[in-house]
């Protein structure tokens, strides 16, 4: 979260830039790291915690967490199984005119749908090519919008789709409404769960799509639109 503009897809963007830097030979190793904090996000983009406002069911809870990843040009000899970034699909800003910062899933879902559709077209594959298509923090509402938008374009990812924001919390026990959100949400899910599934062989290949939005405290208070953005990273087990 920056002082002027919040770009909430820093996990996907960081992994993409690190992979391209290493692949181009500009670095042997690059670190991609990102984080988010619940209190900071609430104070800056919603309401101070002391205010005690009631949250709508469409709201998500920003994850307090951080994840860092080392991308290298050489295989780690100490690792029994290697996981690599096979490809990247760079997304674009998509603006559907949503203004509600308490419904970020609706803001970001169109960008995720555009990215996933473009990835499938670029690599000439079907959703079944991936064991999982994993979005960052759409939450329950954003997930439904994503699946509906893709079905309108003849693509059904309902069997492959997973959202970090839905997985990160136990909604029944913690009452997190639509789910989790924030840069740290996708980062810690990738570091703590997704890579583990790949290394253990439960999955062979995933399309990792951290979702994000572009807004500032000024744009939010002026009631401007909240555009969405997403970048896709293909991660596979060798």
Q: How does the language model describe each region?
A:
Residues 8-32, 69-74, 181-201:
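Active-site-proximal alpha-helical scaffold in enzymes
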């Amino acid at each position: 979260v920056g002082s002027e503009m919040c770009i909430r897809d820093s996990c996907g963007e960081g992994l993409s830039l690190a992979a391209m830097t290493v692949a181009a030979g500009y670095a042997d190793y690059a670190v991609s790291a990102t984080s988010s904090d619940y209190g900071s996000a609430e104070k800056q983009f919603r309401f101070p915690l002391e205010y005690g406002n009631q949250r709508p069911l469409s709201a998500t809870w920003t994850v307090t967490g951080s994840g860092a990843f080392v991308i290298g040009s050489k295989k780690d000899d100490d690792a029994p199984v290697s996981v690599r970034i096979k490809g990247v699909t760079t997304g674009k800003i998509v603006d559907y005119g949503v203004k509600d910062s308490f419904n970020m899933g609706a803001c970001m879902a169109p960008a995720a749908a555009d990215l996933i559709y473009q990835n499938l077209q670029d690599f000439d594959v079907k959703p079944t090519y991936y064991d999982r298509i994993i979005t960052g923090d759409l939450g329950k509402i954003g997930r439904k919008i994503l699946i509906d938008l893709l079905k309108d374009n003849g693509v059904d990812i309902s069997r492959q789709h997973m959202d970090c924001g839905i997985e990160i919390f136990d909604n029944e026990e913690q009452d997190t409404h639509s789910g989790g959100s924030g840069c740290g949400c996708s980062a810690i899910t990738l570091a703590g769960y997704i890579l583990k599934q790949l290394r253990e062989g439960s999955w062979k290949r995933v399309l990792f799509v951290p979702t994000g939005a572009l807004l500032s405290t000024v744009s939010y208070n002026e009631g401007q639109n909240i555009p969405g953005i997403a970048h896709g990273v293909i991660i596979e087990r060798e």
